[in-house]
């Protein structure tokens, strides 16, 4: 009897690896046992669409055509009910039980392969009351596209966090990130707690799909908080490459003290080859303050500036702001597939 159950149980052991085939693209890749589809794809340098990697944003959705998966959590939390019922699942939450055939809305290809390297913090610069620019010098040079991000591991405070590159690749190989002080945040609390110049970090990069798409359409950039970092990085890289397009940059913040890097943005404006408008909007500024600019939510002002020509949306920051901006841009006629977003999720303490 025991031998019988051993044979039966053996039927349910997943293979050492599964093959994921992407319908209509002639593309397939292997997923080792125990890894999610997204995790394995990224390890192999495959540009699988993703954003948060925790099942919230829905960016890594795919349609399961055939095969079975084990879902770590319900994919439904990052998908609408209709999509889930139609067979869509999340790559970050699914471990194959067998070979799969899937369907994607985007064309896969090879991405820049992430590497791991040690890095020394070379500079800390306060940009706002709760934002610091952290510059690091890695042991190995990291190639990345403006708009991508790095996983930053700090052994001293036992934390891993993700931060977007805030400046294009530099000749000396140095890298910059904007770090916001999060209440109770392990890494940000450590960084803000003293001079960390000379401290060693571990970087894994590059990751992420956000970045410039080739077009002549006016760029509607919407940044909330440190969501300015990847947008600034993209715009600065465009200046270096002389690829300027018309830009509307909506910068959402709570109060005047939360606005930062305005000098760098103004320098971009002066050198820009086309239209470049900066529209800061404060949502919680005192009615008795000296602020003469716009108040409320950034989405309230889209209609005033979007006047009919082709547009693309580039949205970075807190998920509620990004979601609201995407909804409003689509309502105003921007095609949803031309709205590119990077949602900043706060990772729980490690």
Swiss-Prot record:
At the top level, the lineage of the source is Bacteria
GO MF annotation, one: ferredoxin-NAD+ reductase activity
The top EC class is oxidoreductase
Q: How the cofactor binds, per note?
A: Binds 1 2Fe-2S cluster per subunit.
Specify where the region named Ferredoxin--NADH reductase lies, as residue ranges: 109-350
- Which keywords has UniProt assigned to this entry? 2Fe-2S, Aromatic hydrocarbons catabolism, Cell inner membrane, Cell membrane, FAD, Flavoprotein, Iron, Iron-sulfur, Membrane, Metal-binding, NAD, Oxidoreductase, Plasmid
All copies of the 2Fe-2S ferredoxin-type domain together span: 16-108
Thermal properties of activity per the entry: Inactivated at temperatures greater than 40 degrees Celsius.
Which positions in this protein are listed as binding [2Fe-2S] cluster? 52, 57, 60, 92
Q: What does this protein do?
A: Component of a monooxygenase that catalyzes the first step in the degradation of xylenes and toluenes. XylA is responsible for the transport of electrons from the electron donor NADH to the terminal hydroxylase component, XylM.
Q: Name the PANTHER family for this protein.
A: NADH OXIDOREDUCTASE HCR, PROTEIN RFBI
What is this protein called in UniProt?
Xylene/toluene monooxygenase electron transfer component XylA
Organism whose genome encodes this protein: Pseudomonas putida
Species lineage: Bacteria, Pseudomonadati, Pseudomonadota, Gammaproteobacteria, Pseudomonadales
Quote the gene name from the UniProt entry. Answer: xylA
């Amino acid at each position: 009897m025991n031998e019988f159950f051993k044979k039966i149980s053996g039927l349910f052991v997943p293979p050492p690896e599964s093959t994921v085939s992407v319908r209509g693209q002639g593309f397939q890749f292997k997923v080792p046992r125990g890894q999610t589809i997204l995790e394995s794809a990224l390890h192999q340098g495959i540009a699988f669409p993703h954003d948060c990697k925790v099942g919230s944003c829905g960016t890594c959705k795919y349609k399961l055509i055939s095969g079975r998966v084990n879902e770590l959590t319900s994919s439904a939390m990052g998908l609408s009910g209709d999509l889930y019922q139609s067979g869509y699942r999340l790559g970050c939450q699914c471990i194959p039980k067998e070979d799969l055939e899937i369907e994607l809305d985007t064309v896969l290809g090879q991405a820049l392969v992430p590497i791991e390297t040690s890095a020394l913090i070379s500079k800390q610069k306060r940009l706002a009351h709760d934002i610091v620019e952290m510059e690091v010098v890695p042991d190995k040079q990291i190639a990345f596209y403006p708009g991508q991000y790095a996983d930053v591991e700090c052994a001293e405070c036992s934390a891993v966090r993700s931060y977007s590159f805030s400046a294009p690749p530099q000749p000396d190989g140095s890298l910059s990130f904007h770090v916001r002080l999060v209440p109770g945040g392990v890494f940000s609390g450590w960084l803000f707690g003293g001079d960390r110049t000379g401290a060693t970090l571990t970087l894994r990069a590059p990751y992420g799909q956000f970045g410039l798409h080739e077009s002549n359409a006016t760029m509607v950039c919407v940044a909330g908080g440190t969501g300015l970092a990847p947008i600034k990085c993209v715009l600065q890289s465009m200046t270096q490459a002389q690829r300027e397009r018309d830009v509307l940059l909506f910068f959402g913040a709570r109060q005047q003290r939360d606005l930062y890097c305005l000098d760098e943005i103004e320098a971009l404006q002066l050198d820009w080859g086309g239209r470049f408008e900066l529209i800061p909007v404060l949502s919680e500024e005192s009615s008795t303050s000296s602020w003469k600019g716009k108040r409320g939510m950034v989405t309230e002002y889209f209609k005033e500036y979007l006047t009919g020509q082709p547009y693309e949306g580039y949205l970075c920051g807190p998920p509620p702001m990004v979601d609201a901006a995407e909804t409003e841009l689509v309502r105003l006629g921007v095609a949803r597939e031309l709205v590119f977003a990077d949602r900043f999720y706060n990772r729980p303490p490690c």
